[in-house]
């Protein structure tokens, strides 16, 4: 029988006392006093921060949206079914963050950056980045000077977009707004621009169709789709654009170029209005809260061209706004027009006439993109906007005038051919060197003897002719980025040779 010695017991007790550590986990908790419609009011979280993540006992995460005298208003990032009055809520001390990095390319994620495409978890994540960030200051920026080619002749010629610009696409529903955005993504293939498409409040079938289009043209390799569809909670629709912007900022801040498309900010404003009214914020014009301008300005100001010291990266934004019966003077359209660096206005009347893309060149403008346009395009498209405006004026005048002089007839004929030339089918972006070539050909009068109905056939076959027999001309335009006398002479000779070979 072993004897327990007192000194051994004492030594063992002393050792355990030395190794004993007191650990206290201090958490600030509150209680749900009201819940419903995706929002909750919580009592007891006196030190909660605006935008802080909260954890409910059911596992649901919420975000602090309102700080009031005796309670906190939170929006829920998920279903509120499992949240009950009296449920315990605890602070996390963290701001809402999402994964960023090249691992998101080719993926479809929800409004919180979680994959929803069935391809498994995200890989190659650089880090988690806060969703709400302050936009780069004036000192960190550089003026827009590099072109972002959309592949759409009417835009690249008359309303050029530069890297780091915010260009609004505005128009009624079903006028081709999303088509312009998707064509722009397709045209970035091989251009070193990473794209983020944010679908806000759209039908799931539409999102699937867009993803299929991008996959078909090999564009998903450099694109991330952030989808907060109409069946998702208003909170997800509200957060999705900020998540898309954060994903794009990773590329911008690491010396790369990114393009983010918000489709559309009208539904984003609806979601924000819904959350604000549910949390009893005072309504203003059209029942929107007073800070709805700041909602969009703080989002769009994050698009920027950074200076060389910070890596010269850029984030370009193409927000989309849907108007009602062409009313650009409504609250949200005027807000976003004043925030952005220009707008592309799509008109339903032009769309129904078969002029697609249905861009109204008269009221569409790019405030900073002119500095980014390549010299060759400036040379050929300098007077294009003015010529089209004069043509529209004459077209209206012709309806009342019986006899016209030859100069006016010639101007109308040239205008008709230009309008026909600027038409473009969807998902067929045109490289800038081909755009320069065809606009030069039209400007020099080589299309004046081609019937209006044959213009698009002429254009298509002329591109094939240049690709197969005169690739050196396209290469020279690509290389020089300007129309030298030598290139002009070669183009003149090429179009004459083409017209002799092919009859129109």
Curated annotation (Swiss-Prot):
Topology in the lipid bilayer is annotated as:
Peripheral membrane protein
An example Gene Ontology cellular component term from the record? plasma membrane
Q: Which Pfam families match?
A: ATP-synt_ab, ATP-synt_ab_C, ATP-synt_ab_N
Where in the cell is the protein located? Cell inner membrane
Record's catalysed reaction(s)? ATP + H2O + 4 H(+)(in) = ADP + phosphate + 5 H(+)(out)
* EC number from the UniProt entry: 7.1.2.2
Q: What is its EC class?
A: translocase
* Keywords per UniProt: ATP synthesis, ATP-binding, Cell inner membrane, Cell membrane, CF(1), Hydrogen ion transport, Ion transport, Membrane, Nucleotide-binding, Translocase, Transport
Under the heading InterPro entries, the entry gives:
ATP_synth_asu-like_sf (IPR023366), ATP_synth_asu_C (IPR000793), ATP_synth_asu_C_sf (IPR038376), ATP_synth_F1_a_nt-bd_dom (IPR033732), ATP_synth_F1_asu (IPR005294), ATPase_a/bsu_AS (IPR020003), ATPase_F1/V1/A1_a/bsu_N (IPR004100), ATPase_F1/V1/A1_a/bsu_N_sf (IPR036121)
Q: What is its main location?
A: membrane
- Molecular function via GO: ADP binding; ATP binding; proton-transporting ATP synthase activity, rotational mechanism
Give the positions of the site Required for activity: 364
Q: Which CDD domains match?
A: ATP-synt_F1_alpha_C (cd18113), ATP-synt_F1_alpha_N (cd18116), F1-ATPase_alpha_CD (cd01132)
Q: What does this protein do?
A: Produces ATP from ADP in the presence of a proton gradient across the membrane. The alpha chain is a regulatory subunit.
State the similarity comment: Belongs to the ATPase alpha/beta chains family.
Q: How does it assemble?
A: F-type ATPases have 2 components, CF(1) - the catalytic core - and CF(0) - the membrane proton channel. CF(1) has five subunits: alpha(3), beta(3), gamma(1), delta(1), epsilon(1). CF(0) has three main subunits: a(1), b(2) and c(9-12). The alpha and beta chains form an alternating ring which encloses part of the gamma chain. CF(1) is attached to CF(0) by a central stalk formed by the gamma and epsilon chains, while a peripheral stalk is formed by the delta and b chains.
What is the official name of this protein in its record? ATP synthase subunit alpha
